[in-house]
Amino acid sequence: MEVSSTVDDLTPGEIRRAIAGFPHAEGYSLRVIPLRYRGDKPHLSAWTDFDQRSITIQIPQPFLPFGEVVPYGAQRRPGKGMRFIWLTEGVTFRTHREVLRFLYLHEWMHWFLKERKGTKSQAETTCDRFALRNYKKRTVTMQDAREALRRRRETTVG
């Protein structure tokens, strides 16, 4: 996979080492660019361009540790209509490496759903669940991706 970076303190080699052990988005390039956030806190930002066959990850600059609430599922509530509550987990990203790993896995799952499963790729909760369960693991497999397609009652981090 072709890897490029315009983030000053993150080289393509460091990016490759950070995602070593993760599945590759075959035929796609990976770009890492700065996110110059406005306001008082950084946030997560990445996208997959299926026409250009690329994954772009934005790393907050300057980098400061930050928290994000990650939705990993929804639970139906009794009553009339389609009522539900989001199941979420708070995550603190302490390093740009953690942000890179989380966002890469999230975007890889979009790639997997479209390119390998042939389904719609707009499954944000599934992609978040996959990234949340796996971004701290040394090795991530296709089996991990298949497990993320089935929501469990609890999420496993680490």
Segment roles from a protein language model:
Residues 86-107:
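Alpha-helix-centered segments that form part of catalytic cores
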Residues 120-152:
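Post-HExxH zinc-binding segment in Zn-dependent metallohydrolases
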Residues 14-21, 104, 126, 130-134:
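Amphipathic alpha-helical segments that form well-ordered structural scaffolds
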Residues 1-74, 79-93:
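A metal-dependent hydrolase signature that marks the N-terminal structural subdomain at the beginning
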Residues 64-67, 111-113, 120-121:
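Short catalytic/ligand-binding loop motif for oxyanion handling, primarily in non-cytosolic enzymes
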